[in-house]
């Protein structure tokens, strides 16, 4: 499984850099493959990473990113599905950061 490639890929977000670990460093093409796969565990791993990143960003920013009213769990996944379909070479982390920007939560 592609998850095994735990990442040492760095990304710049706003004026700060950070290391992206795990699935977030994979390309959106892997997200799309997981979505199409019959392996529900693999799909859940990608979804959990994205939800964890969003939760951490919300915590770090004092909850100022999103509420359940602004976009629910399924809305998040649908947005990321569409984004990754359109941007297969982008990293999953960048896709989630783009979603944060859409929700007004990018620093």
Regions found by a protein language model. Name each.
Residues 1-2:
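Sec-dependent signal peptide recognition
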Residues 10-12:
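N-terminal signal peptide c-region/cleavage motif recognized by signal peptidases
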Residues 16-82:
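Short N-proximal segments of mature Sec-exported proteins
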Residues 73-104:
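Short, compact, well-ordered microdomains
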Residues 107:
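Active-site-adjacent structural elements in enzyme catalytic domains
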């Amino acid at each position: 499984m592609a998850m095994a490639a735990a990442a040492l890929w760095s990304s710049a977000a706003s004026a700060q850099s950070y290391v992206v670990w795990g699935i977030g460093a994979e390309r959106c093409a892997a997200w799309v493959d997981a979505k199409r796969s019959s392996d529900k565990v693999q799909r859940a791993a990608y979804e959990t990473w994205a939800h964890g990143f969003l939760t951490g960003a919300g915590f770090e920013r004092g909850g100022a990113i999103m509420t359940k009213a602004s976009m629910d769990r399924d809305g998040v996944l649908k947005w990321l599905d569409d984004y990754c379909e359109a941007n297969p070479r982008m990293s999953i982390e960048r896709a989630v950061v783009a979603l944060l920007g859409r929700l007004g939560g990018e620093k």
